[in-house]
UniProtKB/Swiss-Prot annotation:
Its main location: Golgi. This is Polypeptide N-acetylgalactosaminyltransferase 35A. Its EC number is 2.4.1.41. Polypeptide N-acetylgalactosaminyltransferases catalyze the transfer of an N-acetyl-D-galactosamine residue to a serine or threonine residue on the protein receptor. Displays the same enzyme activity toward MUC1, MUC4, and EA2. Not involved in glycosylation of erythropoietin (EPO). It can both act as a peptide transferase that transfers GalNAc onto unmodified peptide substrates, and as a glycopeptide transferase that requires the prior addition of a GalNAc on a peptide before adding additional GalNAc moieties. It comes from Drosophila melanogaster. There are two conserved domains in the glycosyltransferase region: the N-terminal domain (domain A, also called GT1 motif), which is probably involved in manganese coordination and substrate binding and the C-terminal domain (domain B, also called Gal/GalNAc-T motif), which is probably involved in catalytic reaction and UDP-Gal binding. Disulfide bonds join 136-371, 362-439, 493-516, 539-553, 580-597. It comes from the Eukaryota. The gene is Pgant35A. Residues 1-6 are cytoplasmic. Its cofactor is Mn(2+). Residues 317-379 are annotated as: Catalytic subdomain B. The keyword Repeat does not apply.
Length: 632
């Protein structure tokens, strides 16, 4: 082809002009055909999705997601209302008072990867903070607005029963009944005893909702196929997929439905607030969007620079290259038109990236709706595997790469070092789907949807800011107190006795009692997030069932979050474990560990919070003068 073009160029300039005209007409015809096929099916999109406006061809300010101290803008109003419930009550919900509490906590972490004791104690419903920005509409919706009705599809496998019921209850309590067509539960062949018998009847009795439909798979199908099973049973205008460990916030559904009503080829995604897996504390998420790396792993990243200039910008919606996949709304008929999910994908993993590529490349869009907020329990691990132990993430990612990424799939294969002989199944049906929908190529996606993604071998986008990184030991924290932890009735203090490594205390060092002295290994600094930090370097951590150590501050709270009364004779309580600090004996060198708080209230478990006096300005100036004299 190149040789033919060269001959044409040599023969005459007119040939070059003709080639250019032919190419231009072909491109115009392709664009018109694609947009016509979308419109002929009745799908509406923002015109900016088909040909991005200049102001949307922006570069990312930061390309890493949610890293500590990264430049992230939150959508929380400065005057956001506080949660109606007393925070101290929430803190006490995880207290382990006896062996039964400990069993519930431990079995919850084993089966669900979160604190089931706290979840049980919260109950069916609770107040949570309204985390929307102040510009979001808080006026009640009426039927006159004529929004489409929604079918909620919630799939689960071996979910914690109280958490599942609360997920449904929040939908019922915070959704206008005329907008809620039904809730469809798809049980992916759960085998936990509490879920095996009479679950549907129990849910109907506790939740008192007649349009609750229950489907139980005859075998494990996985999240991906289970969602399609639920979607095919739905009758609402809009499908809303929700995970089974969530709490929806105030007026969460209306903004999603408004967007889909105006753009029915758009997948509408709420902002996903954070529910701590250890403490169930509900906190607002920053406004971020979805991206991915060349390993096809989803990641959060900042909104492009200049997105949020004035308060009205916080209404959104914002374009997002990918979505996390756990929570989103889509027109039901458009979901079918788009090809649902890839039914040959197994269990979990990669389906969110696949549907993200497919939506954008086939004429749709993904947008984050900041005035819709849904809290989600973010777990540190996935508590289940595939039935046969297969690497479903790898298989699913290979399928999406070979269908949607064209030659760019080679970057994924090289990144993951995938053998060429790895079996990812038959993809012929998905390739036919791509052809039928007249989808764009992956080069178009990279240029128009995700230009910030660095392609290996290409020059980096210069207008994109480099990732912000701060060493963990030098990050700025807001310290609110400085003290020693003295065992009540003694002159012994909690201390770390360990050698320093490169000038820092050794991570993983345990605590023991030592004679109280104002030395760095006994000085504790408390942050506004209730972290207790040794010498402003390492965080006190409940690192095992009973072990207490100092470790790198991960800033995820939970096992590094502590409570005390700030005075004498106080228990020191860990929020994640629900247990308290206790010394083995009131002697020098005695190990400090975690124990039931009921035991810790006695000998070995009560602590005096010995606050250190801050020097006056005069004392500070005198110290500086002495240091200057020494320097001279």
């Amino acid at each position: 082809m190149m040789q033919i073009k060269r001959l044409l160029c040599k023969s005459c300039g007119l040939g070059t002009l003709l080639v250019a005209v032919v190419w231009l007409l072909a491109l115009l015809f392709y664009s018109h055909s694609l947009r016509s096929s979308i419109r002929s099916a009745g799908w509406r999109i923002d015109e900016g999705n088909a040909t991005p406006r200049a102001e949307l061809s922006y570069q990312a300010r930061v390309t890493v997601g949610c890293t500590p101290n990264a430049s992230i803008t939150t959508g929380e109003s400065p005057a956001a209302p506080k949660p109606p419930s007393d925070p101290e009550q929430l803190e006490l919900l995880g207290v382990v008072r006896n062996k039964q509490d400990k069993y519930i906590r431990d079995i919850g972490y084993k089966h669900h990867a979160f604190n089931a004791l706290v979840s049980n104690n919260i109950g069916l419903f609770r107040a949570i903070p309204d985390t929307r920005h102040k510009v979001c509409d808080r006026q009640e919706t009426t039927e006159a607005e004529n929004l489409p009705q929604a079918s909620i599809v919630m799939c689960f496998y071996n979910e914690h029963k109280m958490t599942l019921m609360r997920s449904i209850k929040t939908v019922l309590e915070r959704t206008p009944s005329y907008l809620l067509r039904e809730i469809i539960l798809v049980d992916d062949h759960s085998d936990l005893p509490e879920l095996e018998f009479h679950l549907h009847g129990d849910l109907r009795a506790r939740l008192k909702y007649d349009n609750l439909r229950y489907i139980k798979n005859e075998q494990r199908e996985g999240l991906i196929r289970s969602r399609v099973i639920g979607a095919r049973e739905a009758v609402g205008d809009v499908l809303v997929f929700l995970d089974s460990h969530i709490e929806v916030n105030q007026q969460w559904l209306e903004p999603l439905l408004r967007l889909i009503k105006s753009e029915n080829a758009t997948l509408a995604v709420p902002v996903i607030d954070l529910i701590n897996a250890d403490t169930f504390e509900y906190t607002p998420s920053p406004l971020v969007r979805g991206g991915f790396n060349w390993g096809l792993h989803f990641r959060w990243e900042n909104l492009p620079e200049g997105t949020l200039k004035v308060p009205e910008d916080f209404r959104g919606p914002f374009r997002s290259p990918t979505m996390a996949g756990g929570l989103f709304a889509v027109n039901r008929k458009y979901f079918q038109h788009l090809g649902e999910y890839d039914m040959a994908m197994d269990i979990w993993g990669g389906e969110n990236i696949e549907i993200s590529f497919r939506a954008w490349q086939c004429g749709g869009a993904i947008k984050i709706v900041p005035c819709s907020r849904v809290g989600h329990i973010f777990r540190k691990r996935r508590p289940y595997t595939s039935p046969d132990g297969a690497n479903t993430m790898l298989k699913n990612s290979l399928r999406l790469a070979h269908v949607w990424m064209d030659q760019y799939k080679d970057y994924y294969l090289k990144h993951e070092k995938v053998p060429k002989t790895y079996d990812y199944g038959d993809i012929s049906d998905r390739l036919k789907l791509r052809e039928r929908l007249q989808c764009r190529d992956f080069a178009w996606y990279l240029k128009n949807v995700y230009p910030e993604l660095h392609v290996p071998g290409e020059e980096s986008k210069k207008s994109a800011a480099a990732p912000i990184f701060q060493p963990w030991h030098s990050r700025k924290r807001n310290y609110v107190d400085t003290f020693q932890l003295r065992l009540t009735g003694t002159e012994l203090c909690a201390a770390v006795v360990a050698p320093k490594v490169k000038g820092f205390w050794k991570k993983g060092s345990s605590l023991q009692l030592q004679t109280c002295r104002r030395t760095p290994n006994q000085l504790w600094y408390e942050t506004e997030k209730a972290e207790i930090v040794l010498d402003k370097l390492l965080c006190l951590e409940a690192s095992g069932d009973a072990q207490v150590t100092v470790n790198k501050c991960h800033e995820m709270l939970g096992d590094q979050q502590w409570r005390h009364t700030r005075n004498a004779n106080s228990p020191v309580y860990n929020m994640a474990k629900g247990t308290c600090l206790r010394a083995a004996a009131p002697t020098t060198g005695a190990l400090i560990s975690l124990d039931l708080c009921s035991k810790s209230n006695g000998a070995g478990g009560s602590w005096d919070i010995v606050q250190l006096k801050k020097p006056t300005e005069a004392e500070g100036r005198a110290k500086e003068a002495r240091n200057s004299d020494k320097a001279l």
